[in-house]
Protein backbone atom coordinates (compact mmCIF):
# COMPACT_ATOMS: atom_id res chain seq x y z
CA UNK A 1 0.00 0.00 0.00
CA UNK A 2 1.15 3.55 -0.59
CA UNK A 3 0.17 7.14 0.25
CA UNK A 4 0.83 9.83 -2.34
CA UNK A 5 0.64 13.63 -2.37
CA UNK A 6 0.57 15.58 -5.63
CA UNK A 7 0.53 19.33 -5.16
CA UNK A 8 1.38 22.86 -6.15
CA UNK A 9 1.51 25.88 -3.86
CA UNK A 10 2.54 29.53 -3.61
CA UNK A 11 6.21 28.49 -3.59
CA UNK A 12 6.10 26.44 -6.79
CA UNK A 13 3.42 28.00 -9.01
CA UNK A 14 2.12 31.39 -10.12
CA UNK A 15 -1.32 32.66 -9.17
CA UNK A 16 -2.42 32.05 -12.77
CA UNK A 17 -1.56 28.35 -12.59
CA UNK A 18 -2.97 27.98 -9.06
CA UNK A 19 -6.26 29.36 -10.39
CA UNK A 20 -6.28 26.77 -13.18
CA UNK A 21 -5.88 23.80 -10.82
CA UNK A 22 -8.34 24.97 -8.16
CA UNK A 23 -11.18 22.53 -7.43
CA UNK A 24 -14.74 23.82 -7.25
CA UNK A 25 -17.21 21.49 -5.45
CA UNK A 26 -18.47 20.27 -8.85
CA UNK A 27 -14.97 19.55 -10.13
CA UNK A 28 -14.07 17.85 -6.86
CA UNK A 29 -17.02 15.47 -7.23
CA UNK A 30 -15.97 14.77 -10.82
CA UNK A 31 -12.43 14.06 -9.60
CA UNK A 32 -13.68 11.59 -6.99
CA UNK A 33 -15.72 9.79 -9.67
CA UNK A 34 -12.78 9.59 -12.07
CA UNK A 35 -10.38 8.36 -9.40
CA UNK A 36 -12.79 5.58 -8.42
CA UNK A 37 -13.56 4.58 -12.03
CA UNK A 38 -9.90 4.47 -13.05
CA UNK A 39 -8.94 2.73 -9.77
CA UNK A 40 -6.14 5.22 -9.16
CA UNK A 41 -6.86 5.01 -5.42
CA UNK A 42 -9.29 3.61 -2.89
CA UNK A 43 -9.41 6.84 -0.85
CA UNK A 44 -8.64 10.45 -1.66
CA UNK A 45 -8.77 13.92 -0.11
CA UNK A 46 -8.46 17.10 -2.19
CA UNK A 47 -7.23 20.26 -0.47
CA UNK A 48 -7.85 23.37 -2.57
CA UNK A 49 -7.15 26.87 -1.19
CA UNK A 50 -5.98 30.16 -2.68
CA UNK A 51 -2.36 29.22 -1.96
CA UNK A 52 -2.31 25.49 -2.71
CA UNK A 53 -3.97 22.54 -4.40
CA UNK A 54 -3.00 19.12 -3.05
CA UNK A 55 -4.36 15.67 -3.85
CA UNK A 56 -3.85 12.98 -1.21
CA UNK A 57 -4.28 9.42 -2.50
CA UNK A 58 -4.23 6.03 -0.77
CA UNK A 59 -3.78 2.94 -2.92
CA UNK A 60 -3.79 -0.40 -1.11
CA UNK A 61 -2.48 -2.37 -4.08
CA UNK A 62 0.63 -0.40 -5.07
CA UNK A 63 3.94 -1.33 -3.48
CA UNK A 64 5.61 1.51 -1.56
CA UNK A 65 8.92 0.53 -3.13
CA UNK A 66 10.23 2.52 -6.10
CA UNK A 67 9.53 -0.25 -8.61
CA UNK A 68 8.13 -0.15 -12.14
CA UNK A 69 4.53 -0.65 -11.02
CA UNK A 70 4.82 2.27 -8.61
CA UNK A 71 6.35 4.48 -11.31
CA UNK A 72 3.61 3.64 -13.83
CA UNK A 73 0.93 4.41 -11.26
CA UNK A 74 2.63 7.70 -10.39
CA UNK A 75 2.68 8.74 -14.05
CA UNK A 76 -1.02 7.84 -14.37
CA UNK A 77 -1.84 10.05 -11.37
CA UNK A 78 0.10 13.01 -12.78
CA UNK A 79 -1.52 12.61 -16.20
CA UNK A 80 -4.97 12.45 -14.61
CA UNK A 81 -4.25 15.62 -12.58
CA UNK A 82 -3.35 17.45 -15.80
CA UNK A 83 -6.31 16.04 -17.74
CA UNK A 84 -8.95 16.91 -15.14
CA UNK A 85 -7.88 20.57 -15.44
CA UNK A 86 -7.21 20.40 -19.20
CA UNK A 87 -3.56 21.34 -18.70
CA UNK A 88 -0.44 20.34 -20.56
CA UNK A 89 1.18 17.68 -18.38
CA UNK A 90 4.66 19.23 -18.74
CA UNK A 91 3.37 22.63 -17.61
CA UNK A 92 1.94 21.00 -14.51
CA UNK A 93 4.96 18.78 -13.88
CA UNK A 94 7.31 21.80 -13.80
CA UNK A 95 5.49 23.16 -10.74
CA UNK A 96 4.46 19.88 -9.11
CA UNK A 97 5.83 18.38 -5.92
CA UNK A 98 5.42 14.66 -5.30
CA UNK A 99 5.71 12.96 -1.92
CA UNK A 100 5.09 9.34 -0.99
CA UNK A 101 4.58 7.38 2.20
CA UNK A 102 6.47 8.75 5.23
CA UNK A 103 7.40 11.90 3.30
CA UNK A 104 3.70 12.34 2.40
CA UNK A 105 2.62 11.81 6.01
CA UNK A 106 5.20 14.33 7.20
CA UNK A 107 4.05 16.84 4.57
CA UNK A 108 0.38 16.59 5.56
CA UNK A 109 1.26 17.20 9.20
CA UNK A 110 3.50 20.18 8.32
CA UNK A 111 0.75 21.71 6.16
CA UNK A 112 -1.89 21.24 8.87
CA UNK A 113 0.35 22.85 11.49
CA UNK A 114 0.92 25.91 9.29
CA UNK A 115 4.63 25.21 8.74
CA UNK A 116 4.24 25.24 4.95
CA UNK A 117 2.01 28.33 4.82
CA UNK A 118 2.72 31.73 3.32
CA UNK A 119 2.32 33.09 6.87
CA UNK A 120 4.27 30.74 9.14
CA UNK A 121 2.04 29.10 11.74
CA UNK A 122 -1.26 30.55 10.48
CA UNK A 123 -4.18 28.59 11.98
CA UNK A 124 -6.69 28.82 9.11
CA UNK A 125 -5.08 26.00 7.12
CA UNK A 126 -5.99 23.40 9.76
CA UNK A 127 -9.67 24.26 9.35
CA UNK A 128 -9.28 24.00 5.58
CA UNK A 129 -7.67 20.54 5.87
CA UNK A 130 -10.49 19.43 8.18
CA UNK A 131 -13.09 20.68 5.68
CA UNK A 132 -11.35 18.85 2.82
CA UNK A 133 -11.27 15.62 4.83
CA UNK A 134 -14.93 15.98 5.87
CA UNK A 135 -15.97 16.65 2.28
CA UNK A 136 -14.29 13.43 1.19
CA UNK A 137 -15.83 11.48 4.08
CA UNK A 138 -19.32 12.76 3.24
CA UNK A 139 -18.84 11.88 -0.42
CA UNK A 140 -17.67 8.36 0.45
CA UNK A 141 -20.68 7.79 2.69
CA UNK A 142 -23.07 9.09 0.04
CA UNK A 143 -21.54 6.66 -2.47
CA UNK A 144 -21.52 3.79 0.07
CA UNK A 145 -17.73 3.53 -0.33
CA UNK A 146 -16.20 4.01 3.12
CA UNK A 147 -12.83 5.70 3.35
CA UNK A 148 -10.02 3.26 4.14
CA UNK A 149 -9.27 2.88 7.85
CA UNK A 150 -5.60 3.71 7.25
CA UNK A 151 -6.41 6.98 5.48
CA UNK A 152 -9.01 7.98 8.05
CA UNK A 153 -6.56 7.28 10.85
CA UNK A 154 -3.89 9.37 9.09
CA UNK A 155 -6.08 12.47 9.08
CA UNK A 156 -7.33 11.96 12.64
CA UNK A 157 -3.72 11.55 13.74
CA UNK A 158 -2.79 14.72 11.84
CA UNK A 159 -5.49 16.74 13.61
CA UNK A 160 -4.26 15.56 17.02
CA UNK A 161 -0.66 16.42 16.06
CA UNK A 162 -1.73 19.93 15.00
CA UNK A 163 -3.48 20.38 18.35
CA UNK A 164 -0.37 19.16 20.17
CA UNK A 165 1.86 21.58 18.24
CA UNK A 166 -0.46 24.49 19.09
CA UNK A 167 -0.49 23.46 22.76
CA UNK A 168 3.20 22.64 23.25
CA UNK A 169 4.84 25.37 21.14
CA UNK A 170 4.37 29.12 20.62
CA UNK A 171 3.79 28.74 16.89
CA UNK A 172 0.46 30.60 16.99
CA UNK A 173 1.00 32.99 19.87
CA UNK A 174 2.45 35.98 18.02
CA UNK A 175 0.87 38.22 15.39
CA UNK A 176 2.54 37.99 11.97
CA UNK A 177 0.04 39.83 9.74
CA UNK A 178 -0.66 43.55 9.77
CA UNK A 179 -4.36 43.00 10.47
CA UNK A 180 -3.74 40.56 13.30
CA UNK A 181 -0.94 42.70 14.74
CA UNK A 182 -3.30 45.70 14.88
CA UNK A 183 -5.86 43.66 16.81
CA UNK A 184 -3.20 42.22 19.12
CA UNK A 185 -2.01 45.74 19.87
CA UNK A 186 -5.56 46.76 20.77
CA UNK A 187 -5.88 43.79 23.14
CA UNK A 188 -2.59 44.72 24.82
CA UNK A 189 -3.60 48.33 25.47
CA UNK A 190 -7.18 47.64 26.53
CA UNK A 191 -8.06 44.81 28.94
CA UNK A 192 -11.10 43.76 26.94
CA UNK A 193 -12.59 44.76 23.60
CA UNK A 194 -16.18 43.67 24.13
CA UNK A 195 -17.49 46.96 25.53
CA UNK A 196 -15.36 49.33 23.44
CA UNK A 197 -16.42 51.46 20.48
CA UNK A 198 -14.21 50.66 17.49
CA UNK A 199 -14.03 52.68 14.28
CA UNK A 200 -12.62 51.12 11.11
CA UNK A 201 -11.84 53.45 8.21
CA UNK A 202 -11.82 51.75 4.81
CA UNK A 203 -13.54 48.66 3.42
CA UNK A 204 -10.75 46.73 1.71
CA UNK A 205 -9.22 43.34 2.40
CA UNK A 206 -7.10 44.48 5.36
CA UNK A 207 -10.04 46.12 7.10
CA UNK A 208 -12.10 42.98 6.46
CA UNK A 209 -9.44 40.87 8.19
CA UNK A 210 -9.28 43.34 11.08
CA UNK A 211 -13.07 43.25 11.45
CA UNK A 212 -13.12 39.45 11.47
CA UNK A 213 -10.44 39.33 14.18
CA UNK A 214 -12.31 41.87 16.30
CA UNK A 215 -15.68 40.16 15.96
CA UNK A 216 -14.04 36.86 16.84
CA UNK A 217 -12.90 38.47 20.10
CA UNK A 218 -16.42 39.51 21.05
CA UNK A 219 -16.57 43.12 19.84
CA UNK A 220 -20.18 44.38 19.94
CA UNK A 221 -19.82 48.01 18.80
CA UNK A 222 -18.16 48.39 15.41
CA UNK A 223 -18.34 51.35 13.00
CA UNK A 224 -17.11 51.20 9.41
CA UNK A 225 -16.52 54.47 7.58
CA UNK A 226 -15.75 54.47 3.87
CA UNK A 227 -15.83 56.86 0.94
CA UNK A 228 -18.17 54.50 -0.94
CA UNK A 229 -21.08 53.50 1.29
CA UNK A 230 -22.09 50.63 -0.98
CA UNK A 231 -18.72 48.96 -0.51
CA UNK A 232 -18.92 49.33 3.27
CA UNK A 233 -22.43 47.84 3.24
CA UNK A 234 -21.19 44.94 1.11
CA UNK A 235 -18.46 44.29 3.68
CA UNK A 236 -21.07 44.24 6.46
CA UNK A 237 -23.02 41.60 4.53
CA UNK A 238 -19.89 39.47 4.16
CA UNK A 239 -19.17 39.73 7.88
CA UNK A 240 -22.70 38.56 8.77
CA UNK A 241 -22.75 40.54 12.03
CA UNK A 242 -25.12 43.32 10.92
CA UNK A 243 -26.52 44.07 14.35
CA UNK A 244 -23.05 44.93 15.73
CA UNK A 245 -21.92 47.13 12.82
CA UNK A 246 -22.83 50.70 11.88
CA UNK A 247 -21.90 52.13 8.48
CA UNK A 248 -20.75 55.76 8.26
CA UNK A 249 -19.88 57.98 5.32
CA UNK A 250 -16.60 59.91 5.38
CA UNK A 251 -18.68 63.02 6.07
CA UNK A 252 -19.69 61.31 9.34
CA UNK A 253 -16.10 60.44 10.24
CA UNK A 254 -15.97 63.07 12.99
CA UNK A 255 -19.06 61.55 14.61
CA UNK A 256 -17.32 58.17 14.58
CA UNK A 257 -14.15 59.62 16.11
CA UNK A 258 -16.16 61.26 18.87
CA UNK A 259 -17.35 57.79 19.97
CA UNK A 260 -14.28 55.69 19.24
CA UNK A 261 -11.96 54.10 21.78
CA UNK A 262 -10.01 52.45 18.97
CA UNK A 263 -9.49 53.69 15.40
CA UNK A 264 -7.91 51.47 12.74
CA UNK A 265 -7.53 53.00 9.30
CA UNK A 266 -6.51 51.47 5.97
CA UNK A 267 -7.66 53.26 2.82
CA UNK A 268 -6.09 54.10 -0.52
CA UNK A 269 -6.56 57.82 0.00
CA UNK A 270 -3.75 60.06 -1.32
CA UNK A 271 -4.47 62.62 1.41
CA UNK A 272 -4.75 62.54 5.20
CA UNK A 273 -8.30 61.69 6.29
CA UNK A 274 -7.94 62.06 10.06
CA UNK A 275 -6.34 65.35 11.06
CA UNK A 276 -4.90 66.29 14.44
CA UNK A 277 -7.71 68.83 14.82
CA UNK A 278 -10.36 66.13 14.31
CA UNK A 279 -8.80 63.91 16.97
CA UNK A 280 -8.37 66.86 19.35
CA UNK A 281 -12.08 67.66 18.97
CA UNK A 282 -12.97 64.01 19.61
CA UNK A 283 -10.79 63.89 22.72
CA UNK A 284 -12.45 67.00 24.12
CA UNK A 285 -15.83 65.28 23.82
CA UNK A 286 -14.34 62.07 25.27
CA UNK A 287 -12.62 63.95 28.14
CA UNK A 288 -9.23 62.63 27.01
CA UNK A 289 -10.15 59.01 27.63
CA UNK A 290 -7.52 56.67 26.15
CA UNK A 291 -7.76 56.39 22.36
CA UNK A 292 -5.73 53.97 20.24
CA UNK A 293 -5.18 55.00 16.62
CA UNK A 294 -3.56 52.45 14.30
CA UNK A 295 -2.75 53.78 10.82
CA UNK A 296 -1.92 50.87 8.50
CA UNK A 297 -2.37 52.81 5.27
CA UNK A 298 0.36 53.76 2.81
CA UNK A 299 0.27 56.70 2.22
CA UNK A 300 -0.83 57.51 5.76
CA UNK A 301 -4.46 58.24 6.61
CA UNK A 302 -3.71 59.90 9.97
CA UNK A 303 -1.85 63.13 10.71
CA UNK A 304 1.27 62.08 12.66
CA UNK A 305 0.83 65.05 15.04
CA UNK A 306 -2.01 63.20 16.78
CA UNK A 307 0.59 61.34 18.86
CA UNK A 308 1.24 64.58 20.79
CA UNK A 309 -2.36 64.76 22.01
CA UNK A 310 -3.24 63.70 25.56
CA UNK A 311 -4.55 60.15 25.89
CA UNK A 312 -3.79 59.21 22.27
CA UNK A 313 -1.70 56.13 21.42
CA UNK A 314 -0.67 56.36 17.77
CA UNK A 315 0.94 53.52 15.76
CA UNK A 316 1.84 53.34 12.08
CA UNK A 317 2.36 50.44 9.71
CA UNK A 318 6.12 50.66 10.37
CA UNK A 319 5.51 50.14 14.08
CA UNK A 320 3.44 47.06 13.27
CA UNK A 321 6.08 45.68 10.93
CA UNK A 322 8.70 45.84 13.69
CA UNK A 323 6.28 43.96 15.98
CA UNK A 324 5.66 41.41 13.22
CA UNK A 325 9.40 40.92 12.64
CA UNK A 326 9.99 40.19 16.32
CA UNK A 327 7.06 37.79 16.33
CA UNK A 328 8.29 36.03 13.19
CA UNK A 329 11.57 35.31 14.96
CA UNK A 330 9.59 33.77 17.82
CA UNK A 331 7.60 31.66 15.39
CA UNK A 332 10.78 30.50 13.67
CA UNK A 333 12.01 29.16 17.01
CA UNK A 334 8.66 27.51 17.68
CA UNK A 335 8.62 25.98 14.20
CA UNK A 336 11.80 24.03 14.99
CA UNK A 337 10.10 22.54 18.05
CA UNK A 338 7.07 21.74 15.90
CA UNK A 339 9.25 20.00 13.29
CA UNK A 340 10.66 17.71 16.00
CA UNK A 341 7.15 16.75 17.11
CA UNK A 342 6.00 16.18 13.53
CA UNK A 343 9.01 14.04 12.58
CA UNK A 344 8.41 11.74 15.55
CA UNK A 345 4.65 11.52 15.01
CA UNK A 346 4.97 10.91 11.25
CA UNK A 347 7.50 8.15 11.88
CA UNK A 348 5.21 6.55 14.50
CA UNK A 349 2.24 6.63 12.13
CA UNK A 350 4.16 5.13 9.23
CA UNK A 351 5.49 2.33 11.45
CA UNK A 352 1.91 1.63 12.56
CA UNK A 353 0.75 1.57 8.94
CA UNK A 354 3.41 -0.97 7.96
CA UNK A 355 2.48 -3.26 10.86
CA UNK A 356 -1.23 -2.75 10.16
CA UNK A 357 -0.71 -3.69 6.53
CA UNK A 358 0.85 -7.03 7.47
CA UNK A 359 -1.56 -7.65 10.33
CA UNK A 360 -4.29 -7.71 7.68
CA UNK A 361 -2.23 -10.29 5.79
CA UNK A 362 -1.84 -12.46 8.89
CA UNK A 363 -5.54 -12.20 9.68
CA UNK A 364 -6.45 -13.15 6.12
CA UNK A 365 -4.07 -16.13 6.24
CA UNK A 366 -5.56 -17.33 9.53
CA UNK A 367 -9.11 -16.88 8.22
CA UNK A 368 -8.22 -18.91 5.12
CA UNK A 369 -6.77 -21.72 7.25
CA UNK A 370 -9.82 -21.65 9.51
CA UNK A 371 -12.14 -21.93 6.51
CA UNK A 372 -10.21 -24.97 5.25
CA UNK A 373 -10.44 -26.56 8.70
CA UNK A 374 -14.18 -25.90 8.97
CA UNK A 375 -14.91 -27.33 5.49
CA UNK A 376 -12.95 -30.52 6.08
CA UNK A 377 -14.32 -30.95 9.60
CA UNK A 378 -17.90 -30.62 8.32
CA UNK A 379 -17.27 -33.36 5.74
CA UNK A 380 -15.65 -35.60 8.37
CA UNK A 381 -18.58 -35.19 10.77
CA UNK A 382 -21.00 -36.06 7.95
CA UNK A 383 -18.95 -39.17 7.08
CA UNK A 384 -18.93 -40.39 10.67
CA UNK A 385 -22.66 -39.71 10.84
CA UNK A 386 -23.07 -42.04 7.86
CA UNK A 387 -21.32 -44.82 9.84
CA UNK A 388 -17.99 -44.65 8.00
CA UNK A 389 -14.98 -45.95 9.95
CA UNK A 390 -13.88 -43.10 12.28
CA UNK A 391 -10.18 -43.97 11.99
CA UNK A 392 -10.36 -43.89 8.18
CA UNK A 393 -12.26 -40.58 8.29
CA UNK A 394 -9.66 -39.03 10.62
CA UNK A 395 -6.80 -40.30 8.46
CA UNK A 396 -8.41 -38.73 5.38
CA UNK A 397 -9.14 -35.52 7.29
CA UNK A 398 -5.53 -35.14 8.43
CA UNK A 399 -4.16 -35.97 4.97
CA UNK A 400 -6.42 -33.46 3.18
CA UNK A 401 -5.79 -30.80 5.82
CA UNK A 402 -2.02 -31.19 5.41
CA UNK A 403 -2.24 -31.00 1.60
CA UNK A 404 -4.44 -27.91 1.58
CA UNK A 405 -2.33 -26.06 4.14
CA UNK A 406 0.99 -26.74 2.43
CA UNK A 407 -0.30 -26.24 -1.14
CA UNK A 408 0.30 -22.48 -1.38
CA UNK A 409 3.66 -22.47 0.48
CA UNK A 410 4.85 -25.34 -1.76
CA UNK A 411 3.92 -23.38 -4.89
CA UNK A 412 5.73 -20.32 -3.55
CA UNK A 413 8.91 -22.35 -2.89
CA UNK A 414 8.77 -23.90 -6.35
CA UNK A 415 8.49 -20.44 -7.91
CA UNK A 416 11.51 -19.21 -5.93
CA UNK A 417 13.48 -22.30 -6.98
CA UNK A 418 12.77 -21.54 -10.65
CA UNK A 419 13.85 -17.93 -10.13
CA UNK A 420 16.99 -19.03 -8.28
CA UNK A 421 16.04 -16.86 -5.31
CA UNK A 422 18.31 -18.48 -2.71
CA UNK A 423 17.90 -15.71 -0.12
CA UNK A 424 14.13 -15.80 -0.57
CA UNK A 425 14.10 -19.58 -0.06
CA UNK A 426 16.21 -19.29 3.08
CA UNK A 427 13.92 -16.63 4.57
CA UNK A 428 10.81 -18.58 3.61
CA UNK A 429 12.23 -21.85 4.99
CA UNK A 430 13.17 -20.14 8.23
CA UNK A 431 9.66 -18.68 8.55
CA UNK A 432 8.18 -22.18 8.08
CA UNK A 433 10.63 -23.67 10.58
CA UNK A 434 12.18 -26.03 8.01
CA UNK A 435 15.72 -24.69 7.64
CA UNK A 436 18.22 -27.13 6.13
CA UNK A 437 19.29 -29.79 8.66
CA UNK A 438 22.94 -29.01 8.04
CA UNK A 439 22.28 -25.38 8.92
CA UNK A 440 20.32 -26.33 12.04
CA UNK A 441 22.73 -29.07 13.17
CA UNK A 442 26.20 -28.12 11.98
CA UNK A 443 28.88 -30.81 12.43
CA UNK A 444 31.23 -30.24 15.30
Swiss-Prot record:
Q: Which domain of life is it from?
A: Bacteria
Q: Does this entry carry the keyword NADP?
A: yes
PROSITE patterns named among the record's database cross-references: GLUTR
Keyword Transmembrane attached = no
| Pathway field | Porphyrin-containing compound metabolism; protoporphyrin-IX biosynthesis; 5-aminolevulinate from L-glutamyl-tRNA(Glu): step 1/2
- Annotated residues that bind NADP(+) are located at 202-207
Which reaction equation describes what this protein catalyses? (S)-4-amino-5-oxopentanoate + tRNA(Glu) + NADP(+) = L-glutamyl-tRNA(Glu) + NADPH + H(+)
Q: Which UniProt keywords apply?
A: NADP, Oxidoreductase, Porphyrin biosynthesis
- InterPro entries attached to this UniProt entry: 4pyrrol_synth_GluRdtase (IPR000343), 4pyrrol_synth_GluRdtase_dimer (IPR015896), 4pyrrol_synth_GluRdtase_N (IPR015895), GluRdtase_CS (IPR018214), GluRdtase_dimer_dom_sf (IPR036453), GluRdtase_N_sf (IPR036343), NAD(P)-bd_dom_sf (IPR036291), Shikm_DH/Glu-tRNA_Rdtase (IPR006151)
Q: What class of enzyme is it?
A: oxidoreductase
Which Enzyme Commission numbers does its entry carry? 1.2.1.70
Q: Where is this site: Important for activity?
A: 107
**Active-site positions on this chain:** 50
Concerning PANTHER family, the annotation shows: GLUTAMYL-TRNA REDUCTASE (PTHR43013:SF1)
Q: What is the recorded function of this protein according to its Swiss-Prot or TrEMBL entry?
A: Catalyzes the NADPH-dependent reduction of glutamyl-tRNA(Glu) to glutamate 1-semialdehyde (GSA).
User: What does the comment on domains in this protein's record state?
Assistant: Possesses an unusual extended V-shaped dimeric structure with each monomer consisting of three distinct domains arranged along a curved 'spinal' alpha-helix. The N-terminal catalytic domain specifically recognizes the glutamate moiety of the substrate. The second domain is the NADPH-binding domain, and the third C-terminal domain is responsible for dimerization.
Family that this chain belongs to: Belongs to the glutamyl-tRNA reductase family.
Look up the further comments and give them: During catalysis, the active site Cys acts as a nucleophile attacking the alpha-carbonyl group of tRNA-bound glutamate with the formation of a thioester intermediate between enzyme and glutamate, and the concomitant release of tRNA(Glu). The thioester intermediate is finally reduced by direct hydride transfer from NADPH, to form the product GSA.
Q: How does it assemble?
A: Homodimer.
**The protein's name in its UniProt record:** Glutamyl-tRNA reductase
What species does this protein belong to?
Answer: Mannheimia succiniciproducens (strain KCTC 0769BP / MBEL55E)
Amino acid sequence: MTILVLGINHKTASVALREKVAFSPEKRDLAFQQIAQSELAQSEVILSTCNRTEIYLHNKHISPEADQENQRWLEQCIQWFADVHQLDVDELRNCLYIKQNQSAVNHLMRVSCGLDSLVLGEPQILGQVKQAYQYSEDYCQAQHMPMSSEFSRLFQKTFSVAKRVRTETNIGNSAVSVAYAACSLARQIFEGLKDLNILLVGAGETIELVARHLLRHGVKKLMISNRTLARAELLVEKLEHNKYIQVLSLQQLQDGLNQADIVISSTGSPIVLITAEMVKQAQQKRRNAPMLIVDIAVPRDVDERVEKLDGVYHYTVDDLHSIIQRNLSEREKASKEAETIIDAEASDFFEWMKVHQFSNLIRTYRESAEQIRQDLLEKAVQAIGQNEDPETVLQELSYKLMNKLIHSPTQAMQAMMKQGSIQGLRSFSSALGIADKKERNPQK
